[in-house]
Amino acid sequence: MSYDYRRLVAVVDERVPALMARQIEDAEHPDEGGFVGVDGLAGPNQVSSAATFGYVYLLPESRHHGVEALVERVERAAAWGRRRRTAAGRFDLLVTNFDSSPDTGFTVQALAPVVRAARKAAAAGDAGAARISEALGELIHTAAPGMVAGGFHTPNHRWVLVSALSMAMELFPDLTDRVAPTIEAYLAETIDVNADGEFIERSTSVYNPVVDRSLRLAAESLERWDLLDPVRANLEMSYHLMHGDATVVTSVSIRQDRGAHAVPTGLADSYYTLARRDGN
């Protein structure tokens, strides 16, 4: 099947009404502007959902392109994020991780590309894009020192933090002195990939995709193209672990996907990006 960018835009467009319904609009509610997750909680890390509103506002192919109401929704979400973040600028994952630098890293991964795109549109005269860039960019800038200080919980989190800090530094060069030493310290540990292309958690359907994406994003922000080598190795290995029905072997995992019947859709963006880059 050929790749058609417009099909993906249409899929995102279809998700917008449901996301609007999840955003709390009651001005008297303490979580006004926030998003209610599948767990029924308005977890602070859900501020990353604002990225969808930003994307469809910015994408010319979207039927929501240029709709100012979406800018207002982004700003309300960002205001909620400012109210709910911790003193260190970090966000909670309410079901398990509090004041969490890795979950903040996942949030920055989601928001940074929108800020980058919004800046380009703002430079071309789009006032709404400038508002999106300012609202979401502030969350990223404030979060960076907290990610530096906060540490991580699991192996893949190192690379989530490396990518998030790299993206923050690319957007805000004034952060370089604070975040670059942490990036280099994590990278000095070397990537946890073996000769077969397997990462240490062996999580073929959940965390290997997270590592691949994180290393790829870091490579792009840092222009450290050697970081793509373990991604290539893992994607090659993962291909050989796929069954005919597109599910992947999960019996090797040491994480919660062990034994799951899963299609590794999280690998799709890395396969596509490396295929285009390498002509493979």
What feature does the model see in each segment?
Residues 1-48, 68, 72-76, 80, ...:
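Low-complexity, Ser/Thr/Pro/Gly-enriched N-terminal "stalk/linker" regions
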Residues 3-5, 53-57, 91, 186, ...:
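Sequence-level detector for tyrosine residue identity
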Residues 6-9, 13, 17-21, 137, ...:
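Generic detector of well-ordered alpha-helical segments enriched in charged/polar residues
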Residues 24-35, 87-90, 195-197, 246-250:
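Glycine-centered small-residue hotspots that permit tight backbone geometry or close packing
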Residues 38-228:
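Aromatic-lined, polymer-binding surfaces characteristic
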Residues 225-280:
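Extended polysaccharide-engagement surfaces of secreted carbohydrate-active enzymes
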